[in-house]
Amino acid sequence: PILDEQGLKLFSFSQEHYSEAEILAKFLSIFDKRHPNLVSWNGSQFDLPVILFRAMYHGLSAPSLFDQGELDTQKRYNNYQNRYHHRHIDVMDVMAMFNGRNFQKLDDIACLLGFPGKRGESGYHIPSYVQHEQWLKLTSYCEGDVLNTWLIYLRWLLLKGQLLPQDHEQWIQATIHYLQQQS
C-alpha cells in the first residue's frame, strides 16, 4: 500500500497491462520522485535482488535506490542499502534481530497474528502463473503478500511504541474499510 496525504492506496502494475520493463521502470521511478519508506517481508534477501537483477537486464537505472549520500546528503545515514537504517524496513529481518536463524515465513506470522495469510496459496505457484501468463492470479497473490506485510508492519509499530493501541486499531479498520470499498 501507499500511504500519503490522500490516504491509503493499493495498486499494482500487472503484465496484463504493462511489459516487465515498464513495470520495473514505474516502480523504480517512485524512489526518484517520492523517496518513500519501503516496507517489506524478506525484501532485502529476495524481492529487491530479483527486482534489481531484472532492472539490470532491461538496462534501467535506480540512482535514488542506491544513493548513500552521494546525491542526497540526508541518505548518508538513512538509505535503502543499509539494513539498520529505516528508509527500507525489512520487517522479517528486524524481527529476526538481523539473524538469519530466526527468519520466519510471512504466512506463519500473519496467521499467528490473526491476519489472512496466504489463503492456501504459496510462492511455489508463481513460476506456473508466469509460464501460463496468469497475470491476475499473480497480481492477486502479490497483493495478498503486500496486505499481510502492511498489517504485520502496523503490529510492529505497535510493538515498538510508535502506534498507540487505539491508533493501531484505527489503521486496521481503515485498511478493512479501504478493501471493502475496492471490492
Residue ranges of predicted features:
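Metal-dependent phosphoesterase core characteristic of DEDDh/y 3'-5' exonuclease domains
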Residues: 1-17, 35-140, 144-167, 178, ...
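Short, basic/hydrophobic alpha-helical segments
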Residues: 20-34
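Glycine/proline-rich loop-helix segments at beta-alpha junctions forming the active-site rim
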Residues: 172
